[in-house]
């Protein structure tokens, strides 16, 4: 029988969110249900730094797809995130590191010069990037002192998700890893569980209120929907189907340990 994650065992849960929407997308129901039970939930957004002009061509294309300009993109996304986290009942910490499309080398050239370059299933993570992320996350964890840390598994291979996932593995804390939405829904990621062979998930069976809060929280990130979903008109149904498959017919979110076999 798949073990259930007992939320009342924790006074404070920290959710490491690579970007401003990842926490609500991947574990918004757990956040809402934990908050309802009196648990202090802190969402730490790692990559929400402003781009330094000139903005790369891939970053400008991304902004345009989301309906933003190069100047207002992060401000608009933070407003959406504040609304989303208010819906699910989390407080927020932000580390203001630049996300992949904004990062540059010492000569001012983009580190990732195409949309596909940020997906690194086979490429080696940069030591400098990892060191910066690891240091900032460790400092925040020490300040908040959570009983449990939730971090991304890195499904989909987005370099920012992988950096946060690897940094979390180096924490001297109890860490569980969430399934990265929307990537876990993508056909190209269907074999992600091959990398978790021998590991058993913990399951959070969502309350109706928790699931509703998750969906409402995701809706707050309206500018991102055109880039998140293969089928923007059916994402609610697609997410519901996946959640019910994860929970044996009941809506559920799953969390994995990298240590128990």
Task: Describe the residue ranges of each PLM region.
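Active-site beta-strand->loop->alpha-helix modules in alpha/beta enzyme cores, enriched
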Residues: 1-167
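Hydrophobic alpha-helical membrane context
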Residues: 31-33, 172, 191-192, 232
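Short acidic, gly/pro-rich beta-turn/loop elements at beta-sheet edges
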Residues: 53-54, 188, 215
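Acidic, Ser/Thr-rich peripheral helices and adjacent loops at domain boundaries
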Residues: 61-67, 193-202
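Short, flexible loop segments at boundaries between secondary-structure elements
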Residues: 174-195
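Residues that form or immediately flank small-molecule/cofactor binding pockets and catalytic motifs
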Residues: 48, 97-99, 183, 209, ...
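C-terminal accessory domains and tails appended to enzymatic cores
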Residues: 2-8, 88-89, 107-145, 173, ...
